[in-house]
Each structure stands twice: as structure tokens, then as C-alpha cells.
């Protein structure tokens, strides 16, 4: 933040009613109930540590990626931002979807590989491998911080 690094916090906020037929069908195939982690009005949509500060941008999304329906790409481009460093959950879902969408929108993509995680180790490392093969640069979060000092 001291070095003009914009911090963007994202959260998925949805409802069982807003799930698409495709999402409902996919979960049904696996015998899974509707997820309760991102339902509006529940603790699942609240930020844990680190929490956003007043100067940070908060983007609320309804999809895995941070881009569809948020206007974020245009907002960033209008401010001359062309590089994104991703951290967060989950590596194989929201992080990977957002990173690939960032590539499609001509952003440079970096992944703080020790600041992303998945529920399953093989999915985590598989997603990192796929992202790196697609052109993302992976590095520990400390490497990014040291560049900004």
C-alpha cells in the first residue's frame, strides 16, 4: 500500500436461488447439497484476516472469476494497471478462473504460490502447474514484497 500497490479484495456472494441450472445439475451429479459458504447474510461472505482497509477495493462477484459482471477489467485498465498478483482461495477454482480471465484481458498474471490454497493438495498443485504452463509467473509472496521495497 505504501508503494502504490492497489489491494483488491474479492468475495463471492450468492444465494441458493441464484445458482444456475448448470451449477445445480453439477452438484446433483456428485450428490452434493447447495454450498453454504458464500450465501448472502451468512458469515461465509465475511473477510477473514487480512481484512480490507478503507483504501482497498472490494469487488463482490457472483461467479468464480473476478471479471464477469464486475467491471473490474475496465476499471483497472482506465487506471493504467496491467499486472495482477493473485492470492486467495481456492487455487483450482476462483484463483485459476480469475487468472485465466486476466490472461484473456491482457493482464500480466503472477501467483503468490504460498498465498493460495485448495481443499485438496493434488488440485492445488495441478492448478499451479496449469497456470504456470499458461504463462503465469509463480513465486512466494515474500518475493513480491521484496520487489516493492
Model-assigned labels for residue ranges:
Residues 2-3, 15-21, 25-149:
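Active-site-adjacent betaalpha module
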